[in-house]
Amino acid sequence: MGISSKNGPKKMGRAKTFTGCWTCRGRKVKCDLRHPHCQRCEKSNLPCGGYDIKLRWSKPMQFDPYGVPIPQNSPATTTNLSGSVDEPQYQRRNIDFVRYDEEYVYHEDMDDELTMLHTPPIEKISDNKTWIIKKFGVFKGTDKIDKQYAPRKKRNRKRVAKSLESSASISLSSLPSSSTISFPIRHIEDKLRNKGHVKTGILSANDGVPPTPNLLDYDWNNLNITGYEWISSELRDDALLSAVTLQGHHLGHTQPQEISLEENSNVVSGEEHVNAKEHGCAFEADNQGSSTLPNKAASANDKLYQQNLKLLFQKNSSNSEEPDPQALIDDVFVNIEPRSLPASDLNKITLAPPNEESRMPKSMLELTSYSSDLPPELVDIIPKTDLTVHGLARFLLNHYFNNVADKMTVVVLEKNPWKTLYFPRALMALGDLAGLGQSSNSRNALLNALLAVSCFHLQSKYPRNYKLQKYFLGLGIELRNQASNFLRLCLNTKSSIPEKYKDVLTAILSMNSIDVVWGTMADCQDHLALCEDFVESRMKLRPNISEKTKTLHRIFSFLKLIQDSTALDKVRAKEIVILPSEEDDNYKPLDTSNATTSSSEPRVDVVQEGLFREALNENDGKIHIEFVKEPITNVSADSTPSSTTPPIFTNIATESYYNKSDISKLVSKTDENIIGTDSLYGLPNSLILLFSDCVRIVRHNEYYNLTYLPVPRKFNELSLNFEKRLLKWKSEWNFHQENSEGKSFINSTAEALYHHTMSFYFSLIIYYFTMARSLNCQFLQNYVAKVLDHLNAMEELVDQKKVKIVPLIWQGFMAGCACTDENRQQEFRRWAAKLAESGVGSYWGARQVMLEVWRRRKEDEPGDNWYSVYKDWEMNLMLS
């Protein structure tokens, strides 16, 4: 900018150059540019700064609890650890911007390259080398490691080797002890065979190859995986727990390593002690030159965590063959004749799948030798193996029956299916193993699944890094892996032991329970889709089912409905019954009247005019609801209705869960802790009918959007008719009773059920208007406030009156994502955290989605709704 003088012409200001030495530039004087040191600095007796390019390290990004980056110039980042203000950043204006011939097209390409560079192999950056992948590179920095990100070392290998030589207090093999726990390690069995050590499941002492890092050696309080800092701090532990469990689940061909729960408490046998002595010296010698092994282990562990965190948020394309449900159904009904075991097989007890990918931990079930004296004539006849059920197995089964099964339903039930159907079949598996030496793959899968659910539930009750938390976590990983292997065998291979339909169905549904408890819901969609095809194949072969089977169908139907409400992008063409056609131009209004009785439109929202009844669809085995147009007092549970109102979509089954019993007897007046089996999920039948029809409407609407089809007129009219039913709905359940003071709730449980029902109803209104009508959330804040009030009232009953009720997270999630008020958002956040403490699972995925919706809405970013986040993260949501 020019400077004007009073008397003379304007003088042009000197242009600033950026070619001088750093000292002259700092003094803002002209530099003579002499190399290697300028003459002006020498004359001034100043050290010349030279002409080299100066780079400055950028500070790591920090995020607030909502995942929003904190600006570098904020007070939280402008001071260093010593309290002084950091120097300003230099700008390299004398260096041209880099221009590449090839630019990135997708962010995923850049993320993949940066992920590889984040954990470089040691040989790529050794000897001051720089590893470059296309546009980015990495080199080795300081040797000082930040200990908060490094895995904790529990013991020194040299000390272990010396102690092995001096005493026999530490075992190198798996012991038949009830205090051992299994953790997976890769490629161990082959190494042991090659070196001649086949007795144990642990790496031999003189094997110099580093094992896969221990899954649980990390300090969970300080762990921060690069690239996933946006995960909320309150949910990071649960996310990492899911990643750890996923790591244990996806390890292929693993051989468990037995680790003692109580250190220094094992006693080794003489043979094991000799083996330890033989290999102790070699073990110590190998450690002399293995200083890089801990770094490799940490690097490998970081990479595993990143890979599995990526699996949590992105789709996992499996290369395994999909099972054929029809072939399995044929096998179920063909192999119904009694089996007989040859005498040669009586000594064999099958506790693990034959593929050796997993095994039953010896701390629960163990094979022992029969030591009783027998007559010589019976030595070759009587089996020589026994099955010992340790106290840990009984403890886990007892914990499941008393503490976990009741939380699978919204309210405590007198006849809980998880106690009357699931649990007895797990005990049958134990009986088969003890009596016959083997059980069906489905029962084995169910037994391991129930034990895994108990372990995951128990580990959530202990603080992070606590010994028992790691113990039950590792045990649950192994049991979940084994349950998955048994189920895979059940679905893909034919066994000599016949499978029963209810056994297979409970095994598949139990895997869904594990996914909810252990935190990730990635496999729920696959398990429910498999279950759907399996049930349909069964109904084609034999449509008549028992009451127990119908109960399992009800459980599946409701879980599938909950899953379908969020997995809208997974809609299948067979679900669509209303397609656009040429008849739309001449379309007449849909006649919803009942042709068999009268021409008046049925008012299904008025309970005095009829009864909502359960009906079984013989084509796909799902449960749907019929509205019987007769007074409740004149209709018995088993009578044939004279007129019915079918679901809104007559060609598909509207899923529900309900029993054929009088609605007026739903809430027991005498016992406030026990509710009838009609109310597994604490919702009236008419509300589930509305929920099912609403989900079908939303899925139809999404199918039209995905396939670029015009919306049929018939569908628009059906939607309007449903909207009227939704807004006029009234519950058929009687929550109140008349007394001298007016109306009051029957009991505390009835009051809690009322709040649960109304919170779900108002959330259903929010779900319909946001997903089917694309209404802005600002117009629904009245319903959001009502949902929050009912949830808080229900929570108050649980805390003060000890009402046994575990609400669904569905209504809180839908209302929370639609909430725009920051104070109410914090209330929803607190409610979800409280539900995670009292319920079965942590629901960290749904809670993180809710936080992301609020962040986008606050920053005025596009896609500030749960469905956009669901699609962006490719994350499955199971809100049961």
Swiss-Prot record:
Primary location recorded for the protein, binned into one broad class: cytoplasm
Short name of any one Pfam family annotated for the protein: Fungal_trans_2
Keyword Transferase: no
A GO term, aspect molecular function: DNA binding
Gene3D superfamilies referenced in this protein's UniProt entry, alphabetically: Zn(2)-C6 fungal-type DNA-binding domain
Record-level GO BP terms: arginine metabolic process; positive regulation of transcription by RNA polymerase II; regulation of arginine metabolic process
UniProt key word S-adenosyl-L-methionine: no
Domain of life: Eukaryota
Disulfide bonds: none
Gene Ontology CC, one term: RNA polymerase II transcription regulator complex
InterPro entries found in the cross-reference section: Fun_TF, OAF3, Zn2-C6_fun-type_DNA-bd_sf, Zn2Cys6_DnaBD
DNA-binding region residue numbers: 21-48
Location in the cell: Cytoplasm; Nucleus
Keywords annotated in UniProt: Activator, Arginine metabolism, Cytoplasm, DNA-binding, Metal-binding, Nucleus, Transcription, Transcription regulation, Zinc
Protein role: With ARG80, ARG82 and MCM1, coordinates the expression of arginine anabolic and catabolic genes in response to arginine.
Subunit-level organization: Interacts with ARG80 and MCM1.
Protein name: Arginine metabolism regulation protein II
